[in-house]
Amino acid sequence: MSLSIIFMGTPEFSVPTLRLLADAGHRIVAVYTQPPRPGGRRGLDLQKSPVHQAAELLGLPVFTPVNFKDAEERERFAAFKADVAVVVAYGLLLPEAVLNGTRDGCYNGHASLLPRWRGAAPIQRAIMAGDEKTGMMVMKMDKGLDTGPVALSREVEIGPNMTAGELHDRLMQVGAKAMAEAMVKLEMNDLPLTPQPQDGVLYAAKIDKAETRIDFGRDARDVHNHIRGLAPFPGAWFELEIGGKPERVKVLGSELAEGQGTAGQLLTDDLLVGCASGAVRLTRLQKAGGKPLAAADFLRGTPLGAGTRLS
């Protein structure tokens, strides 16, 4: 036996779930993903999403509506008469006609332990807040923002130096297995739903460019969490005067270290930076237009000594 599934997703995070459901023998009757976007060096090429590309390799039909406001689009969705829709980082709002457009509704893979970190950036926000654990949850979608009842939960530890990129990759695999397990249980009519608690609700707002600059005037642990929560994308940054001009430098790795001194000033010649309390050592950096470099390699090209100001 197998389910007939409409899969809805867009980024690389969604791809392992699509592949695992297909490998499990479910009938993927349609794949919905966001439309191709301008890309390439000049932005002249239209680039298909990772899910779009994966679906084509699997020989699956792909649909790329801009939204579901058109009645014809909603009717096409319902016409598949699918058992269930699986949604993983699709990126479009789904109207009730779509949420109720399959026999068993829509099940979403969400990268947090709900109700903590509902919303667009749960991975980054969990690390930036210093959380020591997070997870993947399979929830049945309703018309609220990540408010539906939970079907399955898998907890994941967040290491003290783990970056958002590393956590993303871990949750991507955990989430795929969780969704595959949930679909087996759904097929067996053995997938009980548990309402989310009313307490502990936090919203994971989309990362704004204005919050990516590093404020060394904060506690060292907060600075470290800020850096790793934004690595590798969009990247936390500071400005450094190079050749008489301010240049933006991204920090893609850091660690807490012993030290105390002026906030935003290098305390040693190996990128130990003072904070309001304590210090952080910058371990991986990237200049504008350059490639990411380990601290030692960065310093070979841009020597910096104790007393240098980072702003």
UniProtKB/Swiss-Prot annotation:
Catalysed conversion reaction: L-methionyl-tRNA(fMet) + (6R)-10-formyltetrahydrofolate = N-formyl-L-methionyl-tRNA(fMet) + (6S)-5,6,7,8-tetrahydrofolate + H(+)
Database matches in Gene3D superfamilies: 3.40.50.12230
Top-level lineage group: Bacteria
Keywords: Protein biosynthesis, Transferase
UniProt-recorded Gene Ontology molecular function terms: methionyl-tRNA formyltransferase activity
Residue intervals passing through the bilayer: none
Binding residues for (6S)-5,6,7,8-tetrahydrofolate: 112-115
Record EC number: 2.1.2.9
Xref: InterPro entries: Fmt, Formyl_trans_C, Formyl_transf_N, Formyl_transf_N_sf, Formyl_transferase-like_C_sf, GART_AS, Met-tRNA-FMT_C, Met-tRNA-FMT_N
CDD domains: FMT_core_Met-tRNA-FMT_N, Met_tRNA_FMT_C
GO cellular component terms given for this protein: cytosol
SUPFAM superfamilies documented for this protein: FMT C-terminal domain-like, Formyltransferase
Family the UniProt entry places it in: Belongs to the Fmt family.
Function: Attaches a formyl group to the free amino group of methionyl-tRNA(fMet). The formyl group appears to play a dual role in the initiator identity of N-formylmethionyl-tRNA by promoting its recognition by IF2 and preventing the misappropriation of this tRNA by the elongation apparatus.
HAMAP family per record: Formyl_trans
Protein name: Methionyl-tRNA formyltransferase
Species of origin: Rhizobium etli (strain ATCC 51251 / DSM 11541 / JCM 21823 / NBRC 15573 / CFN 42)
